[in-house]
């Protein structure tokens, strides 16, 4: 078929091809970084999982395009099915190439504040985090009233927005509103890899580039707020953000302490293989088996002695450049945290399959459990995003509206400002 470069036309074509089961043709539209992270097989699994719930496609709606940002246009295409619907969300560049593709709930599922958020108890304002061409937008949430509140900077994993939007859920917005309701000022921001996605696959890019400059800038922005105690600004990281948090604190001595939510410690290539195998076991079949085998091959290359700065990013896990993986080899989050003279709160979900008690938390415990200023707690019913549930955790669970467990918000708030 003739390739159109108009983002809306591209989005419609992709939905039509997907609905027709022509997944290999959709993969041909993927940018190298997307192709490294997904495949025709993974698209087939995701699509068939959704259609099993919603029934066959009955109609494809009009694409809705957002204003261009960092050279990409985000397009949402509503799809009506026999027993419901879904939204196909894509990021398209000006040549018609796909840089992002996900299946989301119908757009009519708005985020609702959790019961523990009390909007009349805080204010919010927009900020710019960082300077120069890689500056990003953010939000600072400050409790009302007179006080020198503790502050908390939130760090997400992956190319996330400031709310860590996942389906209809916004776990970082849950945290910001819930904590601000309890007397904690919070700064959150769009990741540089979200606003400037081209950075994530650029040669030379590392975890330091992904996290440290903007995290340090956010810490200093919070310290400048007149209602915030500059000596009590902490950093919270979830998943990869939890892994990176000790590195941020090492770079910025004024950080008062760390909160790690499901911070991973197992070498990431091995974790990626574990997750791929878990997903293949949840939904056995040729496509999931092929996806797990592909991840295993990429992980083996990442961990091999043959990995070099010139190894193409498209051959590596997540489409990250070799520089990222070579830098990770020299970074030990537990040892870095242990060298910090700062208090820490480590929380882990018992149902988390992405970061686990057995493979990840055990390393934090071995390195830090004997320290009196370190608190470690497992929320047995929580998944990776700290949503409560029962039974095995699955990616599909993130597409149902949920909120961060109120017990997690209480743990963090009480640790930052112990009840008197």
Ranges and model annotations:
Residues 108-146:
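N-terminal cap/lid segment of alpha/beta-hydrolase-fold proteins
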Residues 382-386, 390-420:
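Catalytic active-site module of serine/aspartate enzymes centered on a nucleophile-bearing elbow/loop
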Residues 154-210, 387-398:
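Cap/lid segment of the alpha/beta-hydrolase catalytic domain
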Residues 251, 257-339:
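Accessory cap/linker subdomain of secreted extracellular hydrolases
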Residues 9, 24-70:
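Short solvent-exposed beta->alpha transition segments
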Residues 204-225:
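Alpha/beta-hydrolase active-site loop
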Residues 340, 346-348:
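Short beta-strand/loop motif that positions the catalytic acidic residue
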Residues 353-360:
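Conserved alpha/beta-hydrolase "acid-adjacent" motif
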């Amino acid at each position: 078929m003739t390739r159109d470069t108009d983002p809306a036309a591209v989005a419609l074509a992709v939905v039509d091809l997907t609905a027709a089961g022509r997944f290999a043709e959709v993969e041909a539209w993927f940018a190298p970084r997307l192709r490294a992270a997904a495949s025709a097989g993974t698209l087939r699994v995701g699509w068939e999982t959704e259609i099993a719930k919603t029934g066959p496609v009955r109609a494809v709606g009009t694409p809705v395009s957002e204003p261009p940002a960092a050279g990409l246009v985000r397009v949402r295409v509503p799809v009506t099915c026999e027993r419901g619907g879904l939204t196909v969300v894509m990021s398209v560049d000006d040549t018609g190439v796909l840089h992002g593709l996900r299946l989301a709930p119908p757009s009519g599922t708005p985020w609702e504040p959790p019961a523990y958020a009390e909007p009349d108890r805080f204010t919010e304002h927009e900020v710019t985090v960082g300077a120069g061409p890689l500056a990003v937008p953010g939000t600072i949430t400050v409790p009302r009233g007179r006080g020198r509140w503790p502050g908390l900077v939130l760090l997400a994993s992956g190319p996330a927005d400031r709310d860590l939007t996942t389906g209809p859920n916004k776990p970082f917005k849950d945290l910001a509103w819930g904590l601000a309701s309890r007397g904690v000022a919070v700064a959150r921001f769009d990741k540089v890899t979200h606003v400037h996605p081209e950075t994530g696959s650029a040669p030379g890019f590392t975890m330091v580039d992904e996290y440290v400059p903007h995290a340090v800038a956010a810490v200093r922005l919070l310290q400048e707020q007149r209602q915030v105690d500059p000596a009590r600004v902490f950093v919270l990281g979830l998943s990869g953000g939890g892994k990176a948090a000790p590195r941020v604190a090492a770079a910025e001595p004024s950080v008062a302490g760390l909160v790690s939510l499901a911070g991973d410690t197992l070498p990431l290539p091995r974790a990626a293989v574990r997750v791929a195998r878990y997903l293949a076991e949840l939904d056995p079949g040729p496509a999931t088996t092929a996806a797990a085998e592909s991840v295993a091959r990429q992980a083996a290359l990442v961990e091999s002695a043959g990995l070099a700065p010139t190894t193409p990013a498209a051959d590596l896990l997540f489409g990250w450049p070799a520089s990222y993986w070579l830098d990770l080899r020299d970074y030990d989050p537990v040892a870095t945290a242990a060298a910090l003279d700062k208090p820490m709160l480590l929380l882990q979900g018992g149902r988390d399959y992405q970061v686990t008690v057995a493979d990840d938390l055990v390393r934090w415990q071995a390195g830090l459990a004997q320290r009196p200023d370190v608190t470690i707690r497992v929320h047995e019913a929580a998944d990776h995003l700290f949503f409560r549930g029962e039974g095995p955790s699955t990616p599909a669970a993130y597409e149902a509206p949920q909120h961060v467990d109120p017990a997690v918000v209480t743990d963090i708030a009480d640790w930052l400002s112990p009840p008197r």
